[in-house]
Regions:
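N-terminal non-globular leader segments, chiefly Sec-dependent signal peptides
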Residues: 34-38, 47-53, 96, 100-104
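Sec-dependent bacterial lipoprotein signal peptides
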Residues: 1-16
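Short solvent-exposed beta->alpha transition segments
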Residues: 27-28, 43-93
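Short, compositionally biased low-complexity segments
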Residues: 3, 37-42
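Exposed beta-sheet edge and beta->alpha loop/turn motif
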Residues: 83-128
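Short, low-complexity N-terminal intrinsically disordered segments enriched in polar/charged residues
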Residues: 16-39
Length: 128
């Protein structure tokens, strides 16, 4: 009986020490990136995209302009995005990728579910 309790205690300690599951970490990262977009921090949103090489400055500026245009379009069509919620996430730890399902709650009371593909690089989750 004592051995069983010892093994159970080891299992609980190991599971607690491992941290949150990768799908939860990817989901939180995706939400943070979209929260930055909604807060008008377009450069930080763009920095959330995975780029194995450095981006030319002109291309990065285009991505920032596109992000601003997207927010403006959502404002025109739906009175803006009020909130971003995490619905679900599925991670493939062998391939270091995840699909995060988010819901946009719009100002006109409609919602839309989107899928954000994510990739993990050196312990950081980025949007693809």
């Amino acid at each position: 009986m004592r051995k069983l309790l010892y093994v159970a205690a080891l299992f609980v300690a190991a599971s607690c020490a491992s941290g949150p599951p990768p799908d939860e970490v990817a989901a939180q990262a995706a939400k943070v990136y979209y929260d930055q977009l909604l807060a008008g921090k377009y450069d930080q949103y763009v920095d959330g995209f995975y780029c194995p090489d450095s981006l030319p400055n002109s291309y990065r500026e285009q991505l920032i302009v596109n992000a601003k245009m997207f927010v403006g379009q959502q404002q025109d069509e739906h009175r803006g995005i009020r909130e971003v919620r995490i619905v679900n996430a599925k991670a493939d730890t062998a391939r270091h990728v995840a699909d995060v399902f988010l819901v946009f709650a719009y100002g006109d009371s409609t919602t839309e579910q989107i899928v954000v593909p994510m990739v993990e690089q050196e312990g950081v989750w980025y949007m693809r």
